[in-house]
Structures are given as C-alpha cells and as structure tokens.
A protein has these predicted regions:
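Extended, alpha-helix-rich binding/interface surfaces that flank or overlap catalytic cores
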Residues: 57
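N-terminal core-binding DNA-recognition domain of tyrosine recombinases/integrases
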Residues: 89-93
Length: 242
C-alpha cells in the first residue's frame, strides 16, 4: 500500500511592511500626478488653510525636501543646514514641478544611501534616515493636499501612506478613524469626529529607543525653524512671501 503524506497548508508569512524609500518614491509620483493636473490653474491663490499662495507652498515643499537631504548629509547636532535651495520664481508651474521632482529624488537618493545608525538634528526630534523619509512623505502628502484643495482638484493622501506616517511620526494619534483623516487632524488641517481641529501641532521624529536629548537651540521655536514658520505648514524653513 502506497502511503501518501497528508497535505498540509502552510501559514502564509505576514506581508513585510513597505520600505520607506518605496513609500517616498510612490508619494512623489502620486503628488506630482495630482499637481500636474492642476498646473494650468491659478497658483497665486492661497493654499488651503495656509498664509502662502499655492506657488509659495510649492517652493516651501521643494525647499523642505532638499533640506532633509542636506541634514542627512551634513549631520549637524544642533542646527539646520546653511544651504537653502528654492525654485526659480520666474519659472512656469510645469517647470517648477520638474524642480520638485529633482528635490524629491535628491532626498530619496540620500535616504537610500544613509546607514541606519546615522542621526541628524531636526527641531522636532533628532532622527534617522527612515524618520526623514517619513517627514518627506508627510510634506508631500500635506502640501499636495493644501494645493489641490485650493485649486479644486480632487485628491487625498493614500491611506497606506498615511498609516505609515502616523505610526512613525505621530505615535499618540487617536485610533478608530481613517488614516488620512487622522493625519489631517494631527497636522491641524481638519477636525476629527469628536475632536476639534488642532491649533498647534508637531510630529515626533525621534528614533524609538534612542536616549532623549534636552534643550532647543537658540533661534528655534517649539514648532519649527526660525525665522518664520506657519503652525500648520510643517517644519521645513519657511519661504518669505515675495
């Protein structure tokens, strides 16, 4: 009698969480597609909920992505970098979006090449490459939302992206809501069921398990870098309105 082994069903391994470089690459393409759809509209209008125009918000976004790469390269212990790269103020919006792609690619390449043990200063928590990737993804998601909402282009940050950002940068975020709605609430952009819209906010970029650092360098507020920063725009250094 030939015995056949009983079939066994293997338990599938849990799916690996997406890598931050993959999330940043996807966020870049998603944001650029939405912004390109709005390229022919009036970018002199104020971005949703911000004091900046849509054009100035785009400049802030490119500056922030470049700055995150610079922080990981220079690795300062107590200050922001001294290089600030912004978009040509005379350039057309489609050309500015090319500049945004350059800034995002620069950030992505730097993050990919940075060893995991590296730390760099940020006013909202000294962080690692994954933390700066999460910040870059957040900047893309939030400011694409700000611009597209102001210009009437339907768009919302992807739920998977928002869930990853919340887990990395907002460990105390409320549960029981959609990730996108929760991220917008955490960053002062919308109310959440049972919770009023936040007036002030910040994320926590510190690496879990690292020893806390005390003190805030001179010239830095609790909500970002000096000299000016809107409380709802994120921590990249603000671009003064032209």
């Amino acid at each position: 009698v030939t015995m056949t082994p009983s079939a066994t069903t293997a338990t599938p391994a849990p799916a690996a969480p997406p890598r931050w470089t993959d999330l940043l690459a996807a966020a870049t393409e998603d944001s650029l597609a939405a912004l390109e759809e709005a390229a022919g509209r009036d970018w002199s209008r104020p971005a949703h909920g911000l004091d900046w125009t849509c054009r100035q918000t785009l400049d802030h976004l490119a500056l922030g992505l470049t700055g995150y790469a610079g922080l990981l390269i220079a690795r300062p212990a107590d200050r922001y970098i001294t290089l600030f790269a912004s978009l040509d103020p005379q350039a057309a919006i489609p050309d500015c979006l090319d500049g945004l792609r350059v800034a995002a690619t620069f950030a992505l390449s730097t993050i990919r090449d940075t060893p995991p043990e590296v730390r760099a200063w940020h006013p909202w928590g000294t962080s690692d490459a994954a933390g700066f990737a999460a910040m870059a993804v957040t900047e893309l998601a939030l400011h694409t939302y700000d611009i597209t909402r102001a210009l009437g282009v339907p768009w919302a940050p992807p739920e998977t992206t928002c869930a990853a950002v919340l887990a990395r940068l907002f460990p105390d975020a409320p549960s029981g809501h959609s990730p996108s709605g929760t991220l917008l609430w955490c960053t002062g952009r919308a109310p959440l069921a049972g919770l009023p819209r936040r007036v002030e906010w910040r994320w926590d970029g510190t690496v879990r398990g690292d020893l806390p650092r005390t003190g805030v360098p001179a010239g830095v507020t609790s909500c970002g870098t000096s000299p000016t920063i809107d409380r709802r725009t994120g921590p990249a250094r603000a671009v003064s309105p032209a």
